Amino acid sequence: MYLDQIKAELVEAQDVLNKFISDENNIKLIQEAALLISNSFKQGGKVLSCGNGGSHCDAMHFAEELTGRYRENRPGYPAIAISDASHLSCVSNDFGYEYVFSRYVEAVGQKGDVLFGLSTSGNSKNILNAIEAAKTKGMKVIAMTGKDGGKMAGLADVEIRVPHFRYADRIQEIHIKVIHILMMLIEFEMAKQA
């Protein structure tokens, strides 16, 4: 009944992944992002992660893998997903949803920390504001985007972009793969210090 559609979905997902892998620069950017985060941790910094919708869930997943564990037992790493419901509702009500992440960065971000922002379009105003706040605080910025990078293109220290122009879910599928690779590389890099 749906077998052809199921196969077509999997083939499209595979094609998006293959296109991403075929650009050697993407592989280098993943390594660069992992080293940037690891170096922040080694110097006493932390990661603040943020996103909207499914990307919000990915931001939370990234932070919990850092504070908890990915594959191996090891010390927790300092990471916070900007996801506190009371903060989000307060700032949304009092200032506007476009400031929910930037207000948090202003409050707890420090020089040497890393902002990890996810936006499949690259146009999320609240992520753009968070990037601006992070730069003001002397933080480094890693952006995970899609399509042509949108307004976030060129703003981050490291931008990992999935150049897919149809649906956001295909971009998110690559984002979660990248997140898992980042976790693995961060664990490798931090183990050198132990």
Curated annotation (Swiss-Prot):
Database matches in CDD domains: SIS_GmhA
According to the UniProt record, one GO cellular component term is:
cytoplasm
Compartments (UniProt record):
Cytoplasm
Cofactor(s) needed: Zn(2+)
Which residues are noted in the entry as Zn(2+)-binding?
Answer: H61, E65, Q172, H180
Pfam (any one): SIS_2
MF term (GO), any: zinc ion binding
| Cofactor binding note of this UniProt entry | Binds 1 zinc ion per subunit.
One of the GO biological process terms: carbohydrate metabolic process
All copies of the SIS domain together span 37-194
* Enzyme Commission number(s): 5.3.1.28
* Pathway assigned in UniProt: Carbohydrate biosynthesis; D-glycero-D-manno-heptose 7-phosphate biosynthesis; D-glycero-alpha-D-manno-heptose 7-phosphate and D-glycero-beta-D-manno-heptose 7-phosphate from sedoheptulose 7-phosphate: step 1/1
Question: Which reaction does this chain catalyze?
Answer: 2 D-sedoheptulose 7-phosphate = D-glycero-alpha-D-manno-heptose 7-phosphate + D-glycero-beta-D-manno-heptose 7-phosphate
What the entry lists under InterPro entries is as follows: GmhA/DiaA, Phosphoheptose_Isoase, SIS_dom, SIS_dom_sf, SIS_GmhA/DiaA_subfam
Q: Which UniProt keywords apply?
A: Carbohydrate metabolism, Cytoplasm, Isomerase, Metal-binding, Zinc
Which parts of the sequence bind substrate? Answer: N52, G53, G54, E65, N93, D94, S119, T120, S121, S124, Q172
Q: Which family does it belong to?
A: Belongs to the SIS family. GmhA subfamily.
Subunit comment for this entry? Homotetramer.
What this chain does, per the record? Catalyzes the isomerization of sedoheptulose 7-phosphate in D-glycero-D-manno-heptose 7-phosphate.
- Misc remark: The reaction produces a racemic mixture of D-glycero-alpha-D-manno-heptose 7-phosphate and D-glycero-beta-D-manno-heptose 7-phosphate.
Q: What is this protein called?
A: Phosphoheptose isomerase
Species for this entry: Haemophilus influenzae (strain 86-028NP)
